[in-house]
Amino acid sequence: MLAKMSFMQNVKNIQEVDVNHKRVLIRVDFNVPLDENLNITDDTRIRESLPTIQFCIDNKAKDIILVSHLGRPKGVEEKLSLKPFLKRLERLLNHEVVFSQNIAQLKQALNENAPTRIFLLENIRFLKGEEENDENLAKDLASLCDVFVNDAFGTSHRKHASTYGTAKFAPIKVSGFLLKKEIDSFYQAFNHPLRPLLLIVGGAKVSSKLTLLKNILDLIDKLIIAGAMSNTFLKALGYDVQDSSVEDALINDALELLQSAKEKKVKVYLPIDAVTTDDILNPKHIKISPVQDIEPKHKIADIGPASLKLFSEVIESAPTILWNGPLGVHEKQEFARGTTFLAHKIANTYAFSLIGGGDTIDAINRAGEKDNMSFISTGGGASLELLEGKILPCFEVLDKRH
């Protein structure tokens, strides 16, 4: 894993190339959450892209073209347009931003002579061929720039036209400051970390994190498994989790993982009690029970107070902490205590804390602890693949130092 991260660290960064009077296309990640009125509820990803954009402004790039996706549109969907982002961008950058409906309109605007201009292209996923890594679309985007900058860590594990494809055909292709910061932070967590190194994994499914867990056992010392995915492990150990969500097909995989952890001397912690309910969406009865005594027809919705105490003690002894996935159904206030408590606990330690996953970040924001974590990764799937020991495809096509 470290060798692969080192390979990705060898990618050239924007500060190593001359952008003066150059046309720069930056693949940013503005895939941010919106409310029902299409207002941005968390602009973290937009703010994280600002240093790269500002660098281009300060170094007098001729034109700066921002390309991003938003959501998973099927064709053109007005509710997923990037046009409403203009005002937020202009306020954050203190600079005018011009919206381009399509590539043809953008090309026409680029022909006009003017001092440094910033363009925001409409949601790139509105264009057919983006997710298929269409070569013609990639070449079209690459033709717009002298320098291509990938600053979208969250999509760097996907071979899309605006990330992987454009980099292949651009004359100069480098990483932005955010991309560099992401890789450097992951490398810091695993290259001679202060030990014990603790990994906390939560979330709904074992299947989404099984590869991660198998590959990372050689690097960690302690492992907390919580969230709905822990139900599968509890059932594998013989506990009756009643109506709780379980991936029965992965019972044997869970047992094998626990055995592998034992052989590698990784201490594994599972919940010892739980907050359960008759109905997660409309709870009428909520109860705290030991995991060996779950109420019939109840579902596990959060970890209980005894588990919180146990996990707190583990966290207090860990100088390096990685966390991916909530510990319960944190979207509902009744079942958010475990995740919120954990966020406060990690924030109040001296540990180097690296946080990944959209749900985890959302929970940390709700807890008001965003500024108290060492590093919050902007990538969900990308950070998981990195932890699984993979080289993210989009790094392969960027220019290397040597």
Curated annotation (Swiss-Prot):
It is an enzyme of class 2 (transferase). Pathway: Carbohydrate degradation; glycolysis; pyruvate from D-glyceraldehyde 3-phosphate: step 2/5. Substrate binds at D29, F30, N31, R45, H69, L70, G71, R72, R125, R158. The keyword Cell membrane does not apply. PROSITE patterns: PGLYCERATE_KINASE. GO terms for cellular component: cytosol. Keywords: ATP-binding, Cytoplasm, Glycolysis, Kinase, Nucleotide-binding, Transferase. Belongs to the phosphoglycerate kinase family. PANTHER family: PHOSPHOGLYCERATE KINASE, PHOSPHOGLYCERATE KINASE 1, CHLOROPLASTIC-RELATED. This is Phosphoglycerate kinase. The gene is pgk.
